[in-house]
Amino acid sequence: MAGAGERKGKKDDNGIGTAIDFVLSNARLVLGVGGAAMLGIATLAVKRMYDRAISAPTSPTRLSHSGKRSWEEPNWMGSPRLLNRDMKTGLSRSLQTLPTDSSAFDTDTFCPPRPKPLARRGQVDLKKSRLRMSLQEKLLSYYRNRAAIPAGEQARAKQAAVDICAELRSFLRAKLPDMPLRDMYLSGSLYDDLQVVTADHIQLIVPLVLEQNLWSCIPGEDTIMNIPGFFLVRRENPEYFPRGSSYWDRCVVGGYLSPKTVADTFEKVVAGSINWPAIGSLLDYVIRPAPPPEALTLEVQYERDKHLVIDFLPSVTLGDTVLVARPHRLAQYDNLWRLSLRPAETARLRALDQADSGCRSLCLKILKAICKSTPALGHLTASQLTNVILHLSQEEADWSPDMLADRFLQALRGLISYLEAGVLPSALNPKVNLFAELTPHEIDELGYTLYCSLSEPEVLLQT
């Protein structure tokens, strides 16, 4: 850091570099090793922010030698977006609120402090306990007042989804009796009691019946596209079973079952063939298909001020592989089926909590509510947050309710580490990178927002 200050001083010595070098050189005596390290990181960030704000960026964005992003040294060089007032305020607040006692920092992150007298150590432990309990109380209050959905609201939303599912099932059996489908079923966070803030979304899984000898699935990593977590569904044995042998041959594009064509087939049924106003009047709901591009979505008003979105999700099962017609973010991969991991992730999370009466699901709900209420964190999905909790469960055994605050902070730090690397491996299938569909700009924004909240995590609960 001193070297960085010297190089900058040669270019534009305005006195700030000298002051910062003096502060850093004496910080260790006042704050200890841990405090000096954190103060150094934050001070360097402010100094570089100031330097870059007064000189237009000219060089391309740089990564660290390890190839990882770092929000201790923000990745703004070459960005077309100039530093705004919110960024400066965020970094200034982080610097001002840093603890002045090195014992407040994680001793696993920095060099261990010198041994302290027992009385002093007891006071520090008591202080840390009070701080932890304060955050614990705020997390529980946030969950009760902001994240938790009243049981009555959940029940009414589920009942509306069940009623509509029954009507759609009856219609398909009557109008399209030759369409090979298994029974439709409801899925999603509302069904699994993991939805937060409002009961406003649920999925209706529509399983297709495929002949096992006519279809096979090819992992995305084995194709020229090299995309783990996605599959091609290939039509097999056309020489023995010509086109038309399977009902779903009509949805084959280039020798592969196209999820987009399957979705278009259901769109004609959902949006074009069913008289939803009449069904809505019968059920005392207001039902209408969502406008494009959300073609396979129904918008339901089941009470005066309560709305529910129902997504129709075609699904195929080949052997042990379950795929859903949820498209890749990039249109060029619209012929790929997505591997369905959410049911297994949810089942593992629930099993872990049931085994030790843990707080994993509670921690997940709080994180989901924060992301849902914070626009800057809107790109984080429930699956990504679930996998952060599952990875943390492999590292930490104690998930008792009184450890909620500690585990919450660890989850934030872990999430920042995954964003720095640009990789979040699936806990169930490590080949799958759950950040693969995020752009570098989105990853930087998420990492910056979370990093600025580390020194004052309560800010996340005020959104």
UniProtKB/Swiss-Prot annotation:
Domain of life of the source: Eukaryota
GO BP annotation list: cellular response to hypoxia; mitochondrial fission; mitochondrial large ribosomal subunit assembly; mitochondrial respiratory chain complex I assembly; positive regulation of mitochondrial fission; positive regulation of mitochondrial fusion; positive regulation of mitochondrial translation; positive regulation of protein targeting to membrane
Residue segments, region Disordered: 57-77
Post-translational modification Phosphoserine, affected residues: 55, 59, 79, 94
Topological region Mitochondrial intermembrane: 1-23
GO MF annotations, alphabetized: ADP binding; GDP binding; identical protein binding; mitochondrial large ribosomal subunit binding
Gene3D superfamilies per record: 1.10.1410.40, 3.30.460.90
Record region (Dimerization): 49-195
Region (Important for interaction with DNM1L): 160-169, 234-243
SMART domains attached to this UniProt entry: Mab-21
Sequence positions that bind ADP: 187, 189, 201, 340, 342, 368
Described purpose of this protein according to its UniProt entry: Mitochondrial outer membrane protein which regulates mitochondrial fission/fusion dynamics. Promotes the recruitment and association of the fission mediator dynamin-related protein 1 (DNM1L) to the mitochondrial surface independently of the mitochondrial fission FIS1 and MFF proteins. Regulates DNM1L GTPase activity and DNM1L oligomerization. Binds ADP and can also bind GDP, although with lower affinity. Does not bind CDP, UDP, ATP, AMP or GTP. Inhibits DNM1L GTPase activity in the absence of bound ADP.
Quaternary structure annotation from Swiss-Prot or TrEMBL: Homodimer. Interacts with DNM1L.
Entry similarity comment: Belongs to the MID49/MID51 family.
Name by which UniProt lists this protein: Mitochondrial dynamics protein MID51
Organism: Rattus norvegicus
